[in-house]
Amino acid sequence: MEIIFRGAALEVGRSCIEIKTDKSKILLDCGVKLGKEIEYPILDNSIRDVDKVFISHAHLDHSGALPVLFHRKMDVPVITTELSKKLIKVLLKDMVKIAETENKKIPYNNHDVKEAIRHTIPLNYNDKKYYKDFSYELFSAGHIPGSASILLNYQNNKTILYTGDVKLRDTRLTKGADLSYTKDDIDILIIESTYGNSIHPDRKAVELSFIEKIKEILFRGGVALIPVFAVDRAQEILLILNDYNIDAPIYLDGMAVEVTKLMLNYKHMLNESSQLEKALKNVKIIEKSEDRIKAIENLSKNGGIVVTTAGMLDGGPILYYLKLFMHNPKNALLLTGYQVRDSNGRHLIETGKIFIGKDEIKPNLEVCMYNFSCHAGMDELHEIIKKVNPELLIIQHGEEVQATILRNWALEHGFDAITPKLGEKIRI
């Protein structure tokens, strides 16, 4: 057996791992790394005979390179949950649309997206299937609705658990991960390490701090701009704003609108579905340019809240709103998600400047950060590792510092742990 790390090795983004035996070849995820330039996994000609692709969840860093396979005329089934399939379709179509609008080249088109979705076979959680020399089963990963950890049981008596992105604790939107796979012996655990060196602050305390800041902005007549990931963070923020009964107009813009409506068709996968329905009814939805113009008029006069994409400021309506509102210190930008290295959001944090188009600008509004992560914190990662108790621990999907700290902890606790480099191959 050989495991090849085609992406997300000592980095966050472009998740893609190949597992190859004498009888089968699969990919675990096929994502992109978003930033000023889009980076792709190593997808050379050796992947042409892949038997199956498993997608852990819809986020583009796990699904965004999937159409590349179909652009190359590959005929390969894709396995994921039904909700992930629907979300992936929305996100991939949007990626093509943005590329066309911004005149950026990406290595696939709308036809390739359609082919990727046509080849996608939905699979329920806890429904074991068999193929060639292995069985496979999906377990709820607790990261976002529809996310899955993937259990692979090979005939050579090697069992592999790929966590994907995972979270043990409940959030308002999603219930924590199902770890029932720990009842079986697992030889190899492939685990994320986004927060391999830090414990998340108390969620309730973060919410209260966030709400207090919004009230402060509204009291001074300002606009609170809240950039969000369309999948998960947008809905989590809507649930929080709804729960605290914020008395101000809340505008929901960008792809978050379509995604929220889609999620409400899968209420069994949501933690607070009735509250999300209520939250959506209480916001002003921006569906066309006239809505946006009217919203900007009202915001300029009276202040208010804008919840919109993109969460890392690399595109989407947030840049339009920033261009208009970033020169007034009464206004504020409230970052609610992880800012990947080389993203516009990370650039703002590190330099105090932001790119809008080709212009690098120093905004004159307040910038705040809040940890509403849907990833496991360091303590949760430790808990998973201890419960699984693998013979080999493979740490990926984390920047070098985070991955290395998690590896060192694992080594100190008696685990055989590695942090593979991009392109590295290991034999089992």
Swiss-Prot record:
EC main group: hydrolase
Job of this protein: Probably an RNase.
PANTHER family named among the record's database cross-references: CLEAVAGE AND POLYADENYLATION SPECIFICITY FACTOR FAMILY MEMBER, INTEGRATOR COMPLEX SUBUNIT 11
Species: Methanocaldococcus jannaschii (strain ATCC 43067 / DSM 2661 / JAL-1 / JCM 10045 / NBRC 100440) (Methanococcus jannaschii)
MF (Gene Ontology): metal ion binding; RNA endonuclease activity
Cofactor (UniProt): Zn(2+)
Annotated protein name in UniProt: Probable RNase MJ4
Binding site for Zn(2+) 2: 61-62, 165, 397
Pfam families in alphabetical order: Beta-Casp (PF10996), Lactamase_B_6 (PF16661), RMMBL (PF07521)
Family in the record: Belongs to the metallo-beta-lactamase superfamily. RNA-metabolizing metallo-beta-lactamase-like family.
EC number: 3.1.-.-
Keywords annotated in UniProt: Hydrolase, Metal-binding, Nuclease, Zinc
Lineage of producing organism: Archaea, Methanobacteriati, Methanobacteriota, Methanomada group, Methanococci
Keyword Phosphoprotein carried by entry: no
InterPro entries cross-referenced by the UniProt entry: Beta_Casp, MBL, Metallo-B-lactamas, RibonucZ/Hydroxyglut_hydro, RMMBL
Binding locations of Zn(2+) 1: 57, 59, 143, 165
